[in-house]
A protein has these predicted regions:
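N-terminal targeting/tethering segments
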Residues: 32-142
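Solvent-exposed, amphipathic alpha-helical "stalk/arm" or coiled-coil-like segments used as scaffolds
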Residues: 74-97, 127-217
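Short, low-structural-confidence N-terminal segments
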Residues: 1-77, 185-228
Length: 228
């Protein structure tokens, strides 16, 4: 059976947005919502495929932008996005091969659970600000549903394998397998090209003054605050 995990609210919002980075706080939740919506609110443009699974321009740009907002250099952000996308797409391929699908009922149940958590969270004002920056709560859920479904299928697969391996081992194995099946030079060039289009925007993020961030890993259910 599928283990529903009580993920921390903001972590869930941003990680489930498919950008693979756990950030919050910063200059403002509104700003984070704006960054995510800047890319995910547009029609998806497929720029590459990993084992047949589409990679969109938007997920690359959003992933890099959020990491830069989180204090990373553009160069480091690109490297991490490449690894994250290869890992994520490979895990999704494995999930499909192992019959890990997500029914409408499972999605609806999870969405309801997540919305309830967000409404009860101590940082719910920040979450409302995030929604506002995104363009509204309904806009967030509408745009994120396909990505959330994919991530839930991956979650099912990981949960089915954790009896013999840790989550990190599963992810590392998926990355190594996926990297061998990916033309890394070609994919890196695609990432360079799509990030060049938002070069000026990334520079503005690098200059921002973010002092407080929230971090959490996928195997922890609480969010800890850290000054930076």
């Amino acid at each position: 059976s599928f283990k529903w995990r009580a993920a921390a609210a903001v972590l869930a919002m941003l990680v489930l947005a498919g950008v693979g980075v756990s950030v919050g706080g910063g200059t403002s939740f509104f700003r984070l919502g704006t960054i995510v919506s800047r890319f995910t609110g547009k029609a998806a443009k497929v720029v590459y495929r990993i084992q047949g699974i589409p990679v969109t321009q938007q997920e690359i740009q959003a992933g890099v932008a959020l990491r830069v907002e989180n204090g990373e250099t553009v160069k480091t952000a690109k490297k991490e996005v490449i690894k994250d996308i290869i890992t994520k797409k490979t895990l999704y391929v494995l999930a499909k091969k192992n019959g890990c699908t997500v029914s409408d009922q499972e999605y609806d149940d999870y969405a309801k659970l997540l919305k309830t958590q967000m409404n009860k969270a101590e940082n719910r004002k920040g979450i409302r600000d995030f929604y506002a920056g995104f363009g509204g709560e309904s806009a967030y859920w509408k745009n994120m549903e396909p990505v959330i479904r994919q991530n839930l299928a991956v979650r099912k697969y990981i949960d089915s394998q954790t009896g013999t391996q840790t989550e990190e081992e599963i992810k590392q194995e998926a990355y190594e397998s996926g990297a061998k099946q990916t033309d890394l030079d070609a994919f890196e060039q695609v990432v360079e090209d799509v990030c060049e289009e938002i070069g000026d925007y990334l520079k503005t993020l690098q200059k921002s003054d973010a002092s407080v961030y929230y971090f959490a890993s996928s195997d922890k259910e609480r969010v800890t605050e850290s000054g930076g």
